[in-house]
Amino acid sequence: MKHIDFYLDFISPYAYLAFEALPRALPGLSHEVTYRPILFAGLLKHHGQLGPAEIGPKRDWTYRHVLWQGREHGIAFDMPAAHPFNPLALLRLAWASARQGTPNRYVCETIFRHVWQGGAPADDVARLEALTAQLAPARDPASDAVKHDLRAATDAALAADVFGVPTFAVDGRVFWGLDALPLLRAQLEGDTRVDEVWACAASVAQGVRR
């Protein structure tokens, strides 16, 4: 059985779409998934980048694209009332609700759908209180231990060469994005073409640096 680490942030529409699409992408393959919520902003800061929603034209394109992708994949999808938003409360809630080391699929699904279905504000205080009551976290989301878990997960993601969300890590390789799901499936199937493209990337000489 193959083990997949799924790095995600609830702020990302692509992470939500990939979360919903993953079971449909891997039927018939023996695998297990560990869900690892991380702070996408931490990755961006580490690499000196702006988020997609922080660049005006890219923001507009992203929202159009994810709405289209949702319809193409048959996934219920609504933009929240405002985006981007601060996802820390949701990320900490996920880790606080983890009863066996990492959050399970139900926890992540519940939080993702809180954000990406219905079109309501993701960070509305009353909605967050209701979400917390629904998940009944075993730990206080505001506790130092929970904050540590989120920081540790983000640091571990960086150490694993994760640079964005959604990212799937398996067999020491990282697969980034919703559109990487077919390549991820090929890796799990043992398709030798994946080895070929991996080797090709390493053979390209570093060109101009800015």
Language-model-derived ranges and their functions:
Residues 7, 47-51, 138:
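Short amphipathic alpha-helical segments at helix-loop
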Residues 1-2:
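A short, charged/proline- and glycine-enriched loop
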Residues 16-115, 198-210:
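Structural alpha/beta surface segment adjacent to cysteine/selenocysteine redox centers
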Residues 5, 14-31, 102, 110-210:
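C-terminal cap of thioredoxin/glutaredoxin-like
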